[in-house]
């Protein structure tokens, strides 16, 4: 719906305050069946991350800084889909597609904040491995909470400032073109494109802000792991066991980065992706890492795997 004058121009300062999320609308009645795979994914996400968080909290063997960081990642992986997927499921099942401007801006903020925070967490994990492998004698000194805060405060402030700026600028726009967003949740550029005024600044910051954060973190992560691998190669084969967790972090980082870049490029450049494919990639960016990060860490990290097997045996005994 668009409110216009006879000449086809927007009436006064009219601005939509509610929007329709029409992701996958071209599927028609088949759209309802999307409830099943997305419900199974959010269920997997909730169960896998909850188990990982429970293990790290309750098992003393997993109370080292490395596992605490993995636990924080699991919390982020659990929270991020909560701001998006429940609304999607209601939309698929009952066609409840409307969202207020405030709700839309909140979704944008939390999705982008958690996304950039995950990137920053991977940076902290690389620092943890750097100190553990390259500076083992001073590891506990650097990883004490008071010492480690100096590494984490600056990235958190950076992420908050970038995301608050993006959301604040988007919230000041007038939306009088239409109120339909071709997505299953509110995405920054999807909302900005509906504005009936100049959005150059929004477009520039929307492109550069998250990209700069992810790129900066990726550069520091790459440098850290390059130093780690060089150090391990010089020290001999016996040290290769120490970088197993590094490889796990790299797998998680690569998996997340590929999904982020695919979703980023599909929405912000001219390409052959259909609207449904673009929406699919964006929803997978929110869901896939959250579902499979705890599984990757559980399978590849020996300490977590052993604690999970102990928990499984304990539950099995209680069930008998």
Task: Show where each model-derived region lies.
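Transmembrane helical core of 7TM receptor-like proteins
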Residues: 1-320
């Amino acid at each position: 719906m668009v409110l216009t004058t006879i000449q086809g121009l927007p009436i006064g300062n009219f601005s939509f305050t509610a929007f329709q999320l029409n992701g996958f609308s071209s599927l028609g009645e088949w759209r309802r069946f999307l409830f099943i795979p997305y419900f199974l994914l959010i269920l997997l996400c909730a169960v896998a991350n909850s188990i990982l968080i429970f293990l790290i909290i309750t098992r003393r063997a997993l109370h080292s800084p490395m596992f605490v960081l993995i636990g924080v990642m699991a919390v982020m992986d659990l929270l991020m889909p909560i701001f998006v997927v429940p609304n999607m499921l209601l939309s698929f099942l009952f066609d409840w597609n409307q969202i207020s401007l405030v709700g839309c801006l909140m979704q944008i903020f939390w999705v982008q904040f958690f996304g950039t925070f995950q990137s920053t967490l991977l940076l902290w994990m690389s620092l943890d491995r750097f100190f553990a492998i390259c500076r083992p004698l001073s590891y506990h000194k650097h990883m004490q909470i008071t010492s480690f805060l100096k590494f984490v405060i600056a990235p958190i402030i950076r992420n908050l400032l970038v995301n608050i700026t993006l959301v604040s600028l988007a919230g000041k726009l007038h939306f009088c073109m239409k109120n339909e967003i071709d997505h299953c949740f509110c995405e920054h550029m999807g909302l900005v494109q509906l504005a009936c005024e100049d959005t150059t600044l929004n477009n520039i910051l929307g492109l550069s802000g998250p990209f700069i954060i992810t790129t900066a973190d990726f550069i520091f992560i790459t440098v850290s792991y390059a130093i780690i691998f060089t150090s391990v190669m010089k020290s001999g084969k016996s040290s290769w066991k120490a970088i197993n967790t590094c490889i796990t972090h790299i797998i998680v980082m690569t998996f997340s980065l590929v999904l982020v870049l695919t979703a980023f490029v599909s929405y912000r450049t001219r390409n052959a992706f259909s609207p449904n494919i673009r929406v699919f990639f964006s929803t997978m960016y929110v869901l896939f890492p959250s579902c499979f990060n705890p599984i990757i860490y559980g399978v590849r990290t020996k300490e977590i795997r052993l604690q999970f097997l102990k928990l499984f045996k304990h539950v099995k005994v209680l069930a008998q």
